[in-house]
Amino acid sequence: MLLTVYCVRRDLSEVTFSLQVDADFELHNFRALCELESGIPAAESQIVYAERPLTDNHRSLASYGLKDGDVVILRQKENADPRPPVQFPNLPRIDFSSIAVPGTSSPRQRQPPGTQQSHSSPGEITSSPQGLDNPALLRDMLLANPHELSLLKERNPPLAEALLSGDLEKFSRVLVEQQQDRARREQERIRLFSADPFDLEAQAKIEEDIRQQNIEENMTIAMEEAPESFGQVVMLYINCKVNGHPVKAFVDSGAQMTIMSQACAERCNIMRLVDRRWAGIAKGVGTQKIIGRVHLAQVQIEGDFLPCSFSILEEQPMDMLLGLDMLKRHQCSIDLKKNVLVIGTTGSQTTFLPEGELPECARLAYGAGREDVRPEEIADQELAEALQKSAEDAERQKP
């Protein structure tokens, strides 16, 4: 079920976030998840539902009457409770590579320096084996919660990779390194705030810190208002034939001329027509050597046969690129709504290729040897492998 948590910190800053949990999830586990999202230690949190505080940490959420879509209030106590901690005390707050999470990161960044120092000193990070540096406990919790695992993979890829590797030692090392790095940054931040206000170096660093906060705030707004801007799109390719040989052509209205790789020209048997007097250097993002030019060749798009000229490049990953010279010559129109390329001189159209039919150099990178696997399948496979390794480790540790 999906629960919305309205969080009020001790400094009266507010934040709202959502958690996907099971109905039989116990309250102490829920407190730990709230700590990861809000930064409020579980021992200092008070959870209220329907104006009634939830106190029994071993009862399930469903036993309190919580259901899908409900809202709970998380308050930070004025003074930490001195009684012994619950089952998951002081779980480490993960720094998701300093990427602001919508609605959660900005208030925490504005905490007073004293509050930050109380949670970020190196002594706290390395002193308590059952507290902030209990990687085995944290690993088991993340592996048991697919929602938190997906957030970790999105916001802290290095730690997620170490977690899914199944190697507890590697996971512990990465976790401690990130905690220590966070402590160093916080100490540097506190030092800058307490430095001489007329120190130019300190002021420059404070200015840079403010600039980084503005960047993260801008990114937070983008993640909330336009999350699609963080996705990747595949380029526009079409099927065609050159001299009777099938070729996948890249449609690029930003390229000045139509080009073809030397390997593709050899496959299409048009290297004999290359005029090497047109040799030179093609400049764009990088540079490529132009071997020469084929002044006239026949390109077949669907049922149309169109005359075209090519500049032949020596080292080019894509076989063929339809540039602006070819597109304007045949009055081509890129219709993204219909996902087609319209040939204006003939009225015919051809569909842009889906990612599965693109050449390997044009597909989105999912990892070596895994180009044909969808991202969600990769995530499921990695999660299954990590759970299996965790179960095997638990079996080996049994007396």
UniProtKB/Swiss-Prot annotation:
One of the record's GO cellular component terms: chromosome
InterPro entries xref list: DDI1_N (IPR033882), Peptidase_aspartic_DDI1-type (IPR019103), Peptidase_aspartic_dom_sf (IPR021109), Ubiquitin-like_dom (IPR000626), Ubiquitin-like_domsf (IPR029071)
Region Disordered, residue ranges: 99-134
Positions of post-translational Phosphothreonine modification: 104
Swiss-Prot/TrEMBL keywords: Aspartyl protease, Chromosome, Cytoplasm, Hydrolase, Phosphoprotein, Protease
EC number: 3.4.23.-
Motif Ubiquitin-binding mapped to chain: 376-395
Protein name: Protein DDI1 homolog 2
